[in-house]
Amino acid sequence: MTKIKLGLLYGGKSAEHQVSLQTALAAIKALNQEKFEIHPIYITEQGQWMRGERIEGEVTSVQALQMSGEANAISPVSLSTEIIPAPASKQEEAIDVIFPLLHGPNGEDGTVQGLLELMNIPYVGNGVLASAAGMDKVVMKNIFAEAGLNQAKYTSFVRSVWEKNREEAYEKVEEALGYPCFVKPANLGSSVGINKCKDREELEKAFEEAFQFDRKIIVEENIIGREVEVGVLGNDDPKCSVVGEIVPKKEFYDYKSKYIDGDTALIIPAEITEEETATIQRDAIRAFQALDGAGLTRADFFLTKDGEVYINEVNTMPGFTPFSMFPLLWQHTGLSYPELIEELIRLAIERHKEKQKIKYTI
């Protein structure tokens, strides 16, 4: 059997660089090396692309995935924007499909997806549109509003306008949303830069912090409810996993809880009614289709005590770390971690073949 040459793309110029490394390590451990040739492609925190030797055998630490040195450096495109083909002497190293294990800006936001589209290489996950819209919480929520999905009230700000009149921004939040509220960078995941604000002093500090990570921020009303999540898998005919619940020991599920402490309980499947499950799964698919999703998403919801469902956000490239909800949801749905990764690769190839049917000449 001919092995699929799989390019694992990880790292990235993003605050979520370390999350990506953890995801890549977990994926490598799960991949069947009898079926796949694993070719590591590392993007440093400075944005330099590095291609390493084919992975054979076990990788035990993220440090082993961090490359350096001119020997490994590559340029994905030339300065003339002409895509660089593989040299004739290295045709055997050409990649069949790319698995981008990138989180945050410059990876999960459509930029790399656009590059891969230009290179005409199959890749796992969402395309340019869904990735870009899914990264920007303001754009995402605008799309959800247009699709008629129930969500929390929100408002947004850009740094340049806020700097000119901070008082006006704070007053707008207090009038439109009140306290408590959540302040978030618009284009970042993994709960980086998110703060819950109970008064003006906390609001001011939260704005300062969020604007360190993005030029645009979103402020949302506080919804009191259980945090539930569901996985979506597929292309044009997506399916949902069982619903899971996050029970954080802290006040909300922040970056440290997600990736460092593991300081949460995951209940899978969530102890909710069949009707609530159906509503959450229905809205997850509606959100997926509104974004024109492909491959996978994880949809996050709030479920209030009176049974009302609010969509919070969609993650277009959920993590695969040991603490990650997405693979756990599918394991409880009947799809093991290795099977899940293989299905994502299959979906990537399927979508690429479908795109080849498009006529580009008249």
Curated annotation (Swiss-Prot):
EC number: 6.3.2.4
One Pfam family it belongs to: Dala_Dala_lig_C
Residues binding Mg(2+) 2, per UniProt: E313, N315
UniProt domain ATP-grasp: residue ranges: 141-346
Residues binding ATP, per UniProt: 174-229
Gene Ontology biological process terms in this record: cell wall organization; peptidoglycan biosynthetic process; regulation of cell shape
Keyword rRNA-binding attached: no
Entry-linked PROSITE patterns: ATP_GRASP, DALA_DALA_LIGASE_1, DALA_DALA_LIGASE_2
Main location: cytoplasm
Domain of life: Bacteria
Keyword Metal-binding part of the UniProt annotation: yes
Disulfide-linked positions: none
Keywords: ATP-binding, Cell shape, Cell wall biogenesis/degradation, Cytoplasm, Ligase, Magnesium, Manganese, Metal-binding, Nucleotide-binding, Peptidoglycan synthesis
UniProt xrefs under Gene3D superfamilies: 3.40.50.20, ATP-grasp fold, A domain, ATP-grasp fold, B domain
Enzyme class, UniProt record, top EC level: ligase
Annotated Gene Ontology cellular component terms: cytosol
Binding-site positions, Mg(2+) 1: D300, E313
Catalytic activity: 2 D-alanine + ATP = D-alanyl-D-alanine + ADP + phosphate + H(+)
Pathway the protein acts in: Cell wall biogenesis; peptidoglycan biosynthesis
An example molecular function term from Gene Ontology annotations: D-alanine-D-alanine ligase activity
Localization in the cell: Cytoplasm
PANTHER family attached to this UniProt entry: D-ALANINE--D-ALANINE LIGASE (PTHR23132), D-ALANINE--D-ALANINE LIGASE A (PTHR23132:SF25)
Cited function: Cell wall formation.
HAMAP family: Dala_Dala_lig
Annotated family: Belongs to the D-alanine--D-alanine ligase family.
UniProt protein name: D-alanine--D-alanine ligase
Organism: Bacillus cytotoxicus (strain DSM 22905 / CIP 110041 / 391-98 / NVH 391-98)
Lineage summary: Bacteria, Bacillati, Bacillota, Bacilli, Bacillales
